[in-house]
Structure formats: C-alpha cells, structure tokens
C-alpha cells in the first residue's frame, strides 16, 4: 500500500494551516475580526482552484483524511472549551432563548429553502446548521452527518461569513435604538443567541460594552453546547426523509463524535485536568479545525459554487433578517416572562 499520498497530504495541509494560523494572528486580522478558520478555507480554495489539480493525486488521501477524521476529532476536542458552569452564569433565560432560537432558525431555514426556494436539501441543512448554532464549525460538523459535497459546504460557510460579518456592523447600531427596551445583559443574550460565529459575537460585544461582551459569549457557548443534540436530531431528520415507510423501523445513524463532544464538555466541567493541559487540548483543537478548513477549501471548485446560483444568498438574507428581527422579539418576550 502506497502511504505517500496520505503523509504528503497531511504535511501539505499542515503547512497551509500553519500559514493560516499565522495570518489569523496578525494585527490586520484581529482588527477586522478575520479568523484563521476563514483564512484557511480561502487559502485552500485559492490553491485548489489554481495549482492543486496538478499534484492532487500525490496528496489526496491525506487531504480527505483531514477533511473527515481530523474534523471529527476537532469537534470532540471542542468540548474542552466549555463547562456546564458556563450555563449558570447567565441563567435559565439564556438557555431557553438559545433553544428557541436554534430550533426556530433551523426550521425557518429548512422551510424557506426547501419548500419555497426549492433548494438542494443538503445545502439547506448545512446553511440552517451554520445560522442556528455556531457558524462554520457547525456547518463542518453537519457535513459529517449529511455527507454533503465540498462545494455545498463552502456555499453554506460563505453565507455564514457574509451575514455574520454584516452583523458586526449592524448590531451595535441596533443596541443604540433598543436601550429603552432591554438592558445590556439582555442584549448580550440577544447577540449570543442570534449571531452566527463566536468571533463575531465577541467582536460585537467588545464594540458595545463589557457586560454585553461577557453575556454574549457565554450565551453563544450555550448554543455551541447544543451542537451535539442538534446533530442527533439532524441524523434522525435525514433518516426520516429517506422515503422509508412509516411502518418500517428507522435506523438512526448516531454521530458518535457528537456524543463524545458532550462527554468531553461534561468531563471538563469537573476541572480534573491541569489548566495547562486543557489549554494544550484547545490549541490542538484549533489547529485541527483550521486544517480541516484548509482541506475543505482544497476540494472546493469555484465552478461548482457558481452553479448554486442566487438562491443560497436569498436564503441567507432572509435568515439573517429572521435572526435580527425575530431574534429580538424572542429575546424581548423571554426577558419579560423569565
């Protein structure tokens, strides 16, 4: 068995990931809140649509491994970023709000994309995952369940990046208008429950107020913790949509990496490991996710994205409006009830 394409592929991916990580830590990237994850996929796409086809057979096995197994490992290790103590800091209000926003956003996206826009189901599911939970990381995690093609994943990530970036500029303006209706703590929960990416949530909070920033990040982390049960629900939903008779028992494919993700978060809550070791796991996790993003970019072709047309961006715009307007109404209502 020729193992060269595997190891050469991993080395190639590692080089791109290291470069993306370096660029993601520059002052320019910090100023414009451009994460290493986004840089990795952009680098991957740039290389993948230019010189990569000339030597793809020499590295393909390693690239595919990075896109699959390394991604799942990264999702599992993501649990070391969270503890259940985070939930107690923001209370029941944030938990209920996050759950309602996750479910409503996903099914709003699915209904709109599949029934009215007649879009590809896998693309709609990926977009719904990214908009309702934690952006690009959720899209990539959902890809492992849906088995979607690379160009569909890239389109979904593009939607998350574009409209999440738009949120960085619009939410601070909305805060000025909404101060008479909700306080800084409540607005933080609103940001955390409705903005796509963790980095975008932090950027918005920092641009407004420390209270907003802290509450928003914790609220967002609660949404991230809902990733595993969401993936289980998505797996069940995909099984139901396969056209199997209702009288037939359905075999639900369990994404075990999602179950392990919950297990790691629970374990991390007991604070049994030295902080230095947990920090190391988080750093390894970041590198694995960056690597899988690079692999995704390499296997994405611009021509395939063009074929998607305008419908994905129409879906992105309407979902963004739901997150901003519907999200505010949900948060305002919950704040009055709880």
Curated annotation (Swiss-Prot):
Source organism, top-level taxon: Bacteria
Does the entry feature the keyword Transmembrane helix, yes or no?
Answer: yes
Keyword Cell cycle present in the record's keywords: the answer is no
Q: Which InterPro entries match?
A: UPF0324_pro, UPF0324_YeiH-like
The transmembrane residues are 5-23, 33-55, 62-84, 94-116, 123-145, 155-177, 222-239, 254-273, 280-302, 312-334
For this protein, the record's NCBIfam families field holds:
YeiH family putative sulfate export transporter
Similarity-based family? Belongs to the UPF0324 family.
UniProt protein name? UPF0324 membrane protein NMA0465
